[in-house]
Curated annotation (Swiss-Prot):
GO terms for molecular function: mannitol 2-dehydrogenase activity; mannitol dehydrogenase activity; NAD binding; NADP binding. It catalyses: D-mannitol + NAD(+) = D-fructose + NADH + H(+). This is Mannitol 2-dehydrogenase. Pfam families: Mannitol_dh, Mannitol_dh_C. It comes from Aspergillus fumigatus (strain ATCC MYA-4609 / CBS 101355 / FGSC A1100 / Af293).
């Protein structure tokens, strides 16, 4: 039987052909359900995480008032619009592990709005009474958050554009849209929707609240006060490794499962979501599908810290040195005994001692689980994905551990090696002289500083929005990172790495 194009009409045939390896949604969609969630930033992670939890609620528990309306704000989001529209907003989740692979057609995304075509439609959707939650996966740079001052980058041209009352009906940024939608709800006497960040940032809800309230105060203090008093911005920790989809993935889906999908998602079996129970206008019963909903924001912060420092910090330790050494995939780096030892020792000796204990969580078991996930060869997680937008990641995943280790007089040599590897990575040339693309919103500034500094980290460390003042004035840190930078420049990653392994 020839592979079938994914759409509503072909679902039953796809299920029959796929047998036990393929699951399809059997719940109602379209006008039969309410779209209670508007999600900005429909990428791979959203479609492997929140959309899957909602799919499970719809499939297993009959929840029909929290279907998702996806939103794309950027011109490049037209590709997702077209892919989803071509298959009735269905897509395939491919779950891969050493035990095999399974395909799950997800139907929780009910519609999609492309803001550049109709910005008013997005604002109206947010203001609709059915909308209870606006969720976000907009990456770190989408929050316009200054890491040094912890304030909104109000001087940014896009924020300035959205702050101009003349542009209220045609915003550019997430905060411009959120403000416009909330203002309309305020005028209509509705409750504010919950703004639910699903991005990989510590205190993501608190940061979102502060950025939006800061934006609103610059536009209308009355609306800002209403948001501050009535709004909800739950903090959350999210986790599921989701590599970029390749053409090989699409071909394999057609050959093995008989599904032709314009943009499937590949992911691992592991998934986790810990979220603070803070919602302004109701929420789905997330607990029914394995979400850890907690009352105490401190508990969320502890889970966040574990995940960001151990998983994401270790990803950084594999990504930047690994790409410089010429590797392509995470599992390839982990197959190298030197890297495997390095990452394990960094987690155990430098990061673990800085982390709080969480009742019911065994940190050693968590670290072992991470090693197992990193070594999964079936998801083909590419290093360039790990290395994307590092200016928003390294200040969260690596530098705080270094700062805390210095404060507590603990070891941090391996963490400095990772930071030094990123400083070399910024130059866009690996140890063999092969150029690669550096994708980062701060690329021009970073590369200019890297060229000016050479093997001296002081130029890059002068970027206060990333590093502040304390670290660049600490002698121990400067000595360690300068040594690592010089060693990498002289000997390359693979010859330098043994110096950082016991």
């Amino acid at each position: 039987m020839a592979p079938l194009k994914l759409n509503s009409r072909n679902l039953s045939q796809i299920a029959a052909a796929g047998g036990a390896l393929v699951k399809i949604p059997t719940y109602q969609r379209g006008r039969a359900v309410k779209e209670g969630i508007v999600h900005i930033g429909v990428g791979g992670f959203h479609r492997a995480h929140l959309a899957v939890y909602i799919d499970q609620l719809m499939q297993k528990h009959g929840v029909n008032d929290y279907a998702i309306c996806g939103v794309g704000l950027q011109p490049f989001d037209s590709a997702m619009r077209d892919a989803l529209a071509s298959q009735d907003h269905l897509y395939t989740l491919i779950e891969r592990s050493a035990k095999g692979s399974f395909a799950h057609v997800i139907g929780s995304i009910n519609s999609y709005l492309f803001a550049p075509d109709n910005r008013e439609a997005v604002i109206a959707k947010m203001a609709h009474p059915d909308t209870k939650i606006v969720s976000l996966t907009i990456t770190e740079s989408g929050y316009y958050y200054n890491e040094n001052t912890h304030e909104l980058q109000s001087e940014h041209p896009d924020i300035q554009f959205d702050l101009d009352p003349a542009n209220e009906k045609a915003p550019r940024t997430t905060f411009g849209f959120l403000y416009a939608g909330l203002t309309r709800r305020y005028q209509q006497g509705l409750k504010p929707f919950t703004v639910m960040s699903c991005d990989n940032m510590q205190k993501n809800g608190s940061i979102t609240r502060h950025m939006l309230e800061s934006f609103a105060r610059l536009r209308n203090p009355e609306v800002a006060e209403w948001i501050a008093e009535e709004g909800a911005f739950p903090n959350a920790m999210v986790d599921r490794i989701t590599p970029q989809t390749s053409e090989t993935d699409k071909t394999a889906l057609a050959e093995k499962f008989g599904i032709v999908d314009s943009w499937p998602v590949v992911t691992e079996p592991f998934t986790q979501w810990v979220i603070e129970d803070q919602f302004s206008d109701g929420r789905p019963p997330f607990e029914k599908v394995g979400v850890q909903v907690v009352k105490d924001v401190h508990a969320v912060e502890q889970f966040e810290k574990h995940k960001l420092r151990l998983l994401n910090g270790s990803h950084s330790a594999l990504g930047y040195p690994g790409q410089l050494a010429g590797f392509q995939y995470v599992h390839e780096v982990m197959a190298n005994p030197l890297f495997r030892k390095f990452v394990w020792q960094m987690m155990q000796e430098e990061v673990k001692p800085l982390l709080p204990e969480i009742p019911g969580v065994d940190i050693d078991e968590y670290c072992n689980t991470l090693i197992e996930r990193f070594t999964n060869p079936t998801i083909m997680d590419q290093l360039p994905r790990i290395c994307l937008n590092a200016s928003g990641k390294i200040p969260q995943f690596i530098m705080p551990s270094i700062a805390e280790a210095i404060w507590e007089t603990g070891p941090f040599r391996r963490l400095c090696f990772v930071a030094a590897a990123w400083f070399h990575y910024i130059k866009g040339v690996d140890d063999r002289g092969k150029p690669f693309e550096v994708v980062d919103p701060m690329r021009e500034e970073l590369q200019a500083k890297a060229r000016a500094g050479g093997n001296d980290p002081s130029e890059l460390l002068s970027i206060k929005s990333l590093f502040g003042d304390d670290l660049r004035n600490d002698e121990r840190f400067l000595r360690e990172i300068t040594t690592a930078m010089n060693d990498i420049a002289r000997d390359g990653i693979m010859k330098t790495l043994p110096k950082y392994i016991n």
